[in-house]
Amino acid sequence: MIEKSAGGRYRVRVFHRGTQVSMKTFDRKKDAETWEAAQKLSVQVGGWIDPKAGAIALASLIEKFNRERKGAVRDHSWDTDESNLRLHIPMKLARRPISSITTGDLETMFTAMMRTHARATVRRHRESVSALFAFAVRYEIVRENIVTKVKLAKGNGKKAREIAPFSEKERDDLISLIRATKPQHADVIEILALTGVRWGELCSLRVFDLQEKPYPAIMVRESESDGYNPADPKSGKTRRVPLDDRAAEILRARALSKNRNDRLFENARGNKLLAAGLTRSLGWSSIAPGKRVYDLRHTAATIWLQSGIDIATVAAWLGHSNSAITHRTYLHYMKTDSDLSGIARINARAAAKRLEMGVED
């Protein structure tokens, strides 16, 4: 109902089942009627949100978002969102009520960030902001997640880092160098390069994850990134990664003197490996300039594709949620094939190479 005050203003009161659920005052009757109609429609279709709920400042909502999700999501996911929202939300925007924030405000924020950051970094920030607004929708603070309406510009900021896989010769030379100078680390580097597992996934591998039937493989069930407790792999699902002859040989040898639940890889003290300790011990920046340990994963993927293994199979081995990610990342390295035939090709290639070098099995 609309009531005109003695001062000439129009007060709107909206009721639901006999209870006043909303009230607002306007200078013009037309504005009051428009607002009343929108509120009544929201009540009727079940999309009504108390306008007072949207008065919470964005900064306060972020605090609530972080507090409610702590321990309920993966630690790494929580840290990523917390960091993005803390570092990349302008203070001027953080002070405003969430209900006042528009798609234009968000587009301005993302566009400004694009000038100084790689598009992939801005995309991850957008994902964190979207998670925040989705949280606000679930808690009936706002009606919709407006972030979904904001598209990122192509960007002219920092160039995204391209993948830098090792060639087969570079990979083999690197492993030979490490076996000669730091043999305790050689198996780690070689398995990363042969299986394409992520660092955290390698750290979580146990003896019982090594399987022989129906073919040699490892079961990737968990990921234990540095500084975090074990969690599901990035895809959220267990996956089977077939082993070529060399990878199977290395892992069988490592499993021989261990118990079923022991880690396949650990440091000299029998504790979890740390990437920083490994790269420091190896002098990684000197022996592999311009490359990251993560590029060993790209190395495995590109060699698989060059061996004729089809994109869907490579995606499954890498633990990608869909083959579109694999296609986008390794577009220039693709051929075709699948599990057993793929491993047969890799083994045949390795055997031919050994024969060329005069090395017998």
Which ranges hold each PLM region?
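Short, Arg/Lys-rich segments that mark the N-terminal edge of DNA/RNA- and chromatin-recognition modules
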Residues: 1-27
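C-terminal secondary-structure termini that scaffold catalytic or DNA-interacting sites
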Residues: 2, 215, 225-247, 257-259, ...
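Basic, Lys/Arg- and aromatic-enriched nucleic-acid-binding interface segment
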Residues: 8, 123-127, 138, 142-205, ...
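N-terminal core-binding DNA-recognition domain of tyrosine site-specific recombinases/integrases
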Residues: 22-27, 63-141, 146, 160, ...
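Short, basic (Lys/Arg/His-rich) helix/loop patches that form interaction surfaces
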Residues: 176-186, 195, 241, 255-264, ...
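Short, polar N-cap/turn motifs at the start of nucleic acid-interacting alpha helices
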Residues: 209-217, 309-329
